[in-house]
UniProtKB/Swiss-Prot annotation:
Name this protein carries in UniProt: Phosphoglycolate phosphatase
Gene Ontology terms for molecular function: metal ion binding; phosphoglycolate phosphatase activity
Family statement: Belongs to the HAD-like hydrolase superfamily. CbbY/CbbZ/Gph/YieH family.
HAMAP family in the cross-refs: GPH_hydrolase_bact
One of the GO biological process terms: glycolate biosynthetic process
Natural source organism: Psychrobacter arcticus (strain DSM 17307 / VKM B-2377 / 273-4)
Active site: D9
Length: 230
């Protein structure tokens, strides 16, 4: 079946935002009287939304047990993190190589593009504006736009419904287990990118439809695999 809709993850797929996120996490920890962590440690905590990132930073590990932290503790820390991240202004966030030109090629080829991220939606428009991508995507969802987020398939299915596209005609593209599972749970083709944030696990171990080490290779594949859109 022809593919009409390409649904992209954001952090770790299109942009590397870890330098800003790490600065905000460490600013939060310092404010709370805790020791900061190296950027490479924080990199492995990114991908499940801001609240989980905050929880991991508070306990200093990727696995957080239920009830390990009081809700009030997380709520306060998350607000401190949000305040710090807002002040960062995205100055250290960069687009991965070939992403800007690749997105424009795909849009010009006739695909509809959507963005589904677990990042809080309040931080997304400013980044899109900075990179000049505000008119690239037909639909944009953040991790708090709906009651559930990836790996739940609901955000992907919601995008399909809004854009009136059969889920079988959509492709989920991302760098982590949350993206691949969301796409698989929505019965979509899934395309993995190996360079992002996947907790140290090779994206190919998740059995995506295809996987790529570079965004330009992904674009070439899409243009050849689904030529009806050209």
């Amino acid at each position: 079946m022809d593919k009409q809709l390409l649904i992209f993850d954001f952090d770790g797929t299109l942009i590397d935002s870890v330098p800003d996120l790490a600065d905000a996490v460490n600013a939060m920890l310092t404010t709370l009287g805790k020791a900061p962590y190296p950027i490479d440690t924080i990199r492995n905590w990114v991908g499940n939304g801001s609240r989980m990132l905050v929880e991991r930073a508070l306990v200093g590990k990727i696995e957080v047990s239920e009830g390990e932290l009081a809700k009030e503790t997380i709520d306060h820390a998350e607000q401190v993190f949000f305040d710090a991240y807002s002040k960062m202004g995205g100055s250290k966030t960069v687009a991965y190589p070939n992403v800007d030109s690749g997105l424009k090629k795909l849009k010009a080829a006739g695909f509809k593009l959507a963005l589904v991220t677990n990042k809080p939606i309040r931080f997304v428009p400013k980044i899109l504006q900075f990179f000049g991508w505000h008119d690239i995507f037909s639909e944009v969802l953040g991790g708090d736009s709906l009651p559930t987020k990836k790996p739940d398939p609901a955000p992907l299915l919601h995008v399909c419904e809004v854009l009136n596209i059969n889920p079988a005609q959509a492709v989920m593209i991302g760098d982590s287990i949350n993206d691949i599972l969301a796409g698989q749970n929505a019965n979509m083709d899934t395309l993995g990118l190996s360079y992002g944030y996947n907790y140290g696990q090779d994206i190919r171990q998740l059995n995506p439809t295809e996987a790529f080490d570079d965004f330009s290779a992904l674009v070439d594949y899409l243009l050849k695999a689904y030529p009806a859109n050209n």
